């Protein structure tokens, strides 16, 4: 699994602050176990669904060995039935590139699929590098 980093996003994409401690444990650890059984990979980063978290949910996920990671850029790409135009998506993404960026692009987006190669090339041409979360301090 070299060069691949899996992050936890929970099993059912529920708002973390609305869940009990047992529900948070289940949402996180059920996915953790499934990924480990399938790939032999132990995840250590979590992105809370919808970016919703509380002190309680952060404390619980920390106790499970997770570090919470948020994003510094996202755009409306998640709705499969309302995809942005490719040209406007490229412009939006490229206009917001910055040092240390954690870019959130949803994998179910056909627009992202179609523009990702161009985006990566353009960002590299701007002098930026792509790094794993493990490489950041």
Please give the residue ranges for each predicted region.
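C-terminal domain-boundary segment and adjacent tail
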Residues: 111-137
């Amino acid at each position: 699994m070299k060069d691949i980093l899996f992050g936890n996003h929970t099993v059912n994409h529920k708002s973390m602050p609305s869940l009990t401690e047992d529900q948070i444990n289940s949402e996180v650890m059920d996915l953790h176990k499934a990924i480990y059984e399938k790939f032999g990979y132990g995840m250590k980063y979590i992105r809370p669904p919808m970016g919703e978290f509380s002190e309680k949910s952060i404390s619980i996920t920390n106790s499970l060995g997770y570090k919470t990671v948020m994003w510094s850029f996202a755009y409306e790409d998640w709705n499969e039935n309302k995809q942005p135009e490719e040209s406007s998506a490229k412009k939006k993404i490229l206009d917001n590139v910055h040092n240390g960026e954690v870019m959130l692009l949803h994998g179910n987006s056909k627009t992202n699929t179609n523009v990702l190669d161009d985006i990566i090339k353009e960002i590299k041409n701007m002098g930026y590098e792509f790094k794993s979360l493990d490489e950041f301090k």
